Swiss-Prot record:
It comes from Neurospora crassa (strain ATCC 24698 / 74-OR23-1A / CBS 708.71 / DSM 1257 / FGSC 987). To endonucleases of group I introns of fungi and phage. It is an enzyme of class 3 (hydrolase). This is Probable intron-encoded endonuclease 1. Gene3D superfamilies: GIY-YIG endonuclease (3.40.1440.10). It is found in: Mitochondrion. It comes from the Eukaryota. NCBIfam families: grpIintron_endo (TIGR01453).
Amino acid sequence: MIKKMKSYINMNSTVTTLGANYLVHTGYFNTISRLKVCTIASYRYYSTSKSDSQSSDLPPVPIFTINNLNNKDSIKSSRILLKDKGGIYSFINTVNNNQYIGSAKDFYLRLNEHLENKKSNIALQKAFTKYGLDKFIFCIYEYFTYESKIISHKALTDLETSYINRFNFDNLYNFKAIATSSLGYKHTEEARLKMVDYYKDKNNHPMFGKTHTEEALGLISKPGELNPMFGKKHSEATKASMSEKKNKYPLGVGIYDLEDNLILKFSNNVELAKYLGISKVTVGKYLNSGLVYNKTYRFKPIQD
């Protein structure tokens, strides 16, 4: 493994294997926009506004790694280490040393999202399929702990960008050199050309080998005024019926205590999210993972 990661790791440095409490209680902390950022391996300051001349020429050193990504039990055993800890992570391909760099507010949830292909990078997923999960290592370059989940998104993406810029962009699965939310984002010319090159291989296109149904083709071929639904609106009853059919949880979802007692019931995860004042994405994460929310509740589908 050391030979495979040689281009990323300073061999004179110590890659620390962290115990459950080590992540929280040790290390050198530097506050960046309310983030507690820890850089154990190289003890360096990292700022989003000022570069560190002493470390800018050195590749980042992982402070924690996980192998056996194809072993679900191995992933579950890392939960205590990764849960409620965020920062900068990477998936490194041990065959060619290409990697994907990302940021997360919860390493455990984000790792599982990638492994289950939920909101993951397309190029990274193709590499998982081509090489196998056993040829990848999950690495943490920098982390922070927090008591509240309300964390500056910009500070985190700025930190991610600083790490992306430390590597040759051609060796990254990332499509963007600047980490941002995709909302309202316009790709740089460099990123656009990288995506064009990626999709030259038809196998990389999400619709390659797939066909639309006759019904879908009929609707596509009738845009605008030719479409039978043009200018029409669904009735409230029809909308309710369509919503019910699309609902993943036909009996609704509920908030349960830690003893599995139902506290409140909702028609869907959107209603639950509105009640707690959180996003439906957050609710979905906890519904799918079965993890405890706010150390008090679990979100679960209502069963018969």
